[in-house]
Regions:
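Predominantly extracellular beta-rich ligand-binding scaffolds that present long acidic/polar faces
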Residues: 81-94, 99, 354-356, 373-500
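Intrinsic-disorder-associated interaction segments
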Residues: 1-5, 9, 357, 475, ...
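Right-handed parallel beta-helix
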Residues: 244-255, 268-301, 306-311, 316-337, ...
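Intrinsic-disorder/low-complexity regions
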Residues: 40-47, 70, 99, 112, ...
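Extracellular beta-strand/beta-solenoid scaffold signature
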Residues: 111-126, 196-202, 231-238, 256-265, ...
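Extracellular polysaccharide-degrading/modifying enzymes targeting complex plant/algal/animal polysaccharides
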Residues: 2-267, 279-303, 312, 491-500
């Protein structure tokens, strides 16, 4: 093991800054073989969109357009678009022009407007947003200089109650104890669909569930205190669904409480995400069913939060995330995952390459949870290579009950049947908990590790690796013997290890 000197850490910061600048400055080199359509802030949806001089204006026009496979939509650099895009099969979404990557933000407007806020509780300095809003993962102030702590009350007996004491009604005035605390109260639509053996009414959470947002702001009206307030609403920005062969290239996708780019189904083919900036993602409430596997003690009425940068939930064949800068994500920067529930899913030909990931709870996540008798599902030909993965568990997503889950590579401890799975040439730079969590039922399903660099604080966990058919592998410690541990237990070929005092 080498010790990470001040000079080493300074050089590491410089390397990451160069990588970040390279990604943010990526040229528009992607080729569109079909018809190209253009979109800009000063366009008109009545235009045909067929040239930069006759662009469309809105994302709704893009979503509703009858695009064909091979077509592409280019958004003007320097422009800001709000809302989401319903993608079409075989279509490329990219940039044109000069300047910064075109920006896609989740909510309809910036909230730094004094007229959007009214004083709700003078004594406790709590402000109410005057317009209805979707559930939000958090609020981000001044481009990331500060963010809110989201409170997540449970719902029982027709009202909100405190998560840690369900016998105590939730009152914002009593529970919002810190500056910039926020809570969303959304219970206009209820469902009795059963969960956890119960069927009492709980709030419906979907794209139509609007309600009230409350924010504690000790310095006054938030719209006067801050010049920039972005909400992370429960909304996907690029909804891929089951559309095959979608490409998203050279876009900046930020501020959404669900997923930046989301696909899934039986077998999603050919999703490519390249040269993108993705930040401040996730944290919205998925549901109140109480089925969060990381909070098994929670009953019906407790929340599950979620939100990933790029996600495939289901089978896939040909899935690439490459040369992207992803940061401040509530869950994973990028992930492929499925609970099979007795079905058959193949997750094939997956590539996560040359990305820079910072301040996410999971830099890269995968899992294959084979349940209800499934014995056939598998992962095959997975490559995680050339990535710089930094500060797992040190971002805003740690405002969660399960603070022991962060990892740079998070495979959890499921069956995770896999073949030809390689993790090589990556830099793992500090994690609040495990650096790696690579467990499968059988040892041969664990990834081959080669030429990876590990930088971690001495005494913190290195992680877990190995088979769990008989027992869960132990959590390994990152200590002076970490290099030997990596060679002997993880089977890492040619590791490079730096300890941080």
């Amino acid at each position: 093991m080498s010790h990470a000197t001040k000079e080493f850490l300074t050089a590491l910061e410089e390397t990451c800054a160069r990588r970040r600048d390279e990604i943010l400055g990526s040229a528009d080199e992607i080729t569109i073989i079909g018809q190209t359509y253009y979109v800009s802030n000063d366009g008109d949806d009545g235009n045909d969109g067929l040239s930069p001089e006759r662009p469309w204006r809105t994302l709704r026009r893009v979503s509703e357009a009858p695009l064909s496979e091979g077509d592409g939509v280019r958004f003007r650099r320097g422009d800001l678009f709000r809302g989401g895009v319903d993608t079409k099969p075989g279509v490329t979404y990219a940039a044109y022009g000069e300047g910064d990557k075109p920006k896609f933000y989740g909510w309809d407007k910036n909230l730094a407007d004094p007229s959007l806020w009214e004083l709700w509780d003078k004594e406790h300095r709590i402000w109410h947003l005057t317009e209805p809003i979707l559930d939000c993962g958090t609020l981000v102030f001044e481009g990331g200089q500060a963010h809110s702590r989201k409170l997540i009350p449970s719902y029982r007996d027709g009202g909100f109650v405190c998560r840690d004491d369900e016998g105590r009604p939730f009152h914002p005035s009593a529970e919002m104890t810190r500056d910039l605390d926020m809570v969303c109260i959304i219970d206009g639509r209820l469902t009795s669909h059963p969960s956890k053996g119960e069927n009492f009414p709980i709030p419906i959470m979907d794209g139509e569930s609007l309600g009230d947002l409350y924010l504690r702001c000790d310095r006054g009206n938030p719209g006067e205190v801050f010049g920039d307030i972005e909400a992370l609403p429960r909304r996907r920005i690029f909804a891929v669904g089951g559309n095959n062969n979608v490409t998203v290239d050279n876009l900046c996708i930020k501020y959404t409480g669900e997923h930046a780019i989301a696909g899934g189904g039986g077998c999603l083919r050919g999703l490519r995400v390249t040269n993108c900036e993705i930040g401040w993602i996730g944290g919205a409430i998925q549901h109140y069913f109480g089925t969060d596997p990381n909070y098994p003690e929670g009953g019906r009425g407790t929340v599950t939060r979620y939100g990933n940068g790029v996600e495939i939930y289901g089978g896939c064949d040909g899935y690439t995330v490459e040369n992207c800068y992803v940061y401040q994500v509530y869950d994973a920067a990028m992930t492929h995952q499925i609970n099979t529930c007795g079905g058959f899913f193949g997750l094939r030909n997956i590539r996560y390459r040359r990305n820079l990931v910072e301040y996410c709870v999971y830099s890269i996540e995968y899992f294959l949870d084979k349940t209800q008798g499934d014995t056939r599902s598998f992962m095959e030909n997975c490559e995680i290579s050339g990535n710089i993965l930094r500060f797992s568990g040190y971002g805003w997503g740690q405002q969660r009950h399960n603070t022991h889950t962060p990892a740079h590579i998070k495979g959890w401890s499921f069956e995770n049947t896999a073949r030809n799975f390689r993790i090589r040439g990556n830099l793992f730079d500090r994690a609040a908990y495990r650096m790696i969590h690579l467990v499968a039922r059988e040892e041969e399903s664990c990834p081959v590790m080669e030429d990876n660099v590990y930088v971690q604080r001495l005494g913190l966990p290195l992680g877990q690796y190995g088979a769990n058919a008989e027992a869960e592998p132990p959590i390994l410690v990152f200590d002076e013997g970490a290099e030997e541990t990596l060679r002997a237990i993880v089977g890492e070929i040619n590791p490079t290890v730096y300890g941080v005092e």
